[in-house]
């Protein structure tokens, strides 16, 4: 059984990690241990590089806390141009997989507040009245009328980031 350290305690992210690992390695093939670690970037990262740096930092910090694991996984959400997205970073001590998620264009009324220094999650909670929306369906669920959720979009990115770990051509 793979010991997987999730560098987050966010339920939407943990669900995506678990589903993706079980899709690739088989149901019941992994045990997820969530840990809260620092990203080393602002609460609301801007741009692809800052967001990816946050995910990489979280993986490194999780690895230092739990060096005995088989995999360390981080999902860092950010804002790039007029959209929200995330970076997924997965490390197994030998190689790393990284993938960027799909992007969701955000309306100006939301972006204006985020650009003024507020984080997307709290802005969306105020807009929708849903407490801790970032730990649930997120802006993605709201603006896709529930057709997608944070977790479903993250799931795809985790699957992509896992590609180097089960395809020999990457080695």
Swiss-Prot record:
Q: Catalysed reaction(s)?
A: XTP + H2O = XDP + phosphate + H(+); ITP + H2O = IDP + phosphate + H(+)
Phylogenetic classification of the source organism: Bacteria, Pseudomonadati, Pseudomonadota, Gammaproteobacteria, Enterobacterales
**Span of the signal peptide:** none
Q: Give the GO molecular function terms.
A: ITPase activity; metal ion binding; nucleotide binding; ribonucleoside triphosphate phosphatase activity
Similarity comment? Belongs to the YjjX NTPase family.
NCBIfam families the record matches? inosine/xanthosine triphosphatase (TIGR00258), PRK05074.1 (NF003459)
Cofactors: Mg(2+); Mn(2+)
Has UniProt tagged this entry with the keyword Magnesium?
A: yes
Q: What organism is recorded for this protein?
A: Salmonella paratyphi A (strain AKU_12601)
Enzyme class label: hydrolase
UniProt KW keywords = Hydrolase, Magnesium, Manganese, Metal-binding, Nucleotide metabolism, Nucleotide-binding
The name on file for this protein is: Inosine/xanthosine triphosphatase
Textual note on the cofactor? Binds 1 divalent metal cation per subunit; can use either Mg(2+) or Mn(2+).
Subunit and interaction comment = Homodimer.
Which residues are involved in binding Mg(2+)? 38, 68
The UniProt annotation places substrate binding at 8-13
Q: Does the keyword Nucleus apply?
A: no
Record's function text: Phosphatase that hydrolyzes non-canonical purine nucleotides such as XTP and ITP to their respective diphosphate derivatives. Probably excludes non-canonical purines from DNA/RNA precursor pool, thus preventing their incorporation into DNA/RNA and avoiding chromosomal lesions.
């Amino acid at each position: 059984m793979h010991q997987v350290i999730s560098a987050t305690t966010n339920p939407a992210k943990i669900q995506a990690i678990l589903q993706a690992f079980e899709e690739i390695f088989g149901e019941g093939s992994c045990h997820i241990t969530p840990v809260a670690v620092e990203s080393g970037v602002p609460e609301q990262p801007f741009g692809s590089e800052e967001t990816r740096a946050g995910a990489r930092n979280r993986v490194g910090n999780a690895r230092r806390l739990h060096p005995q694991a088989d995999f360390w996984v981080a999902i860092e959400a950010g804002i790039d141009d007029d959209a929200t997205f995330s970076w997924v970073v997965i490390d197994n001590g030998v190689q790393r997989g990284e993938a960027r998620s799909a992007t969701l264009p955000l309306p100006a009324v939301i972006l204006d507040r985020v650009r003024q220094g507020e984080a997307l999650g709290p802005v969306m909670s105020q807009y929708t009245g849903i407490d801790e929306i970032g730990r649930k369906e997120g802006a993605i669920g709201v603006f896709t009328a529930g057709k997608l959720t944070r977790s479903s979009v993250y799931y795809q990115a985790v699957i992509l980031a896992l590609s180097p770990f089960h395809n020999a051509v990457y080695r």
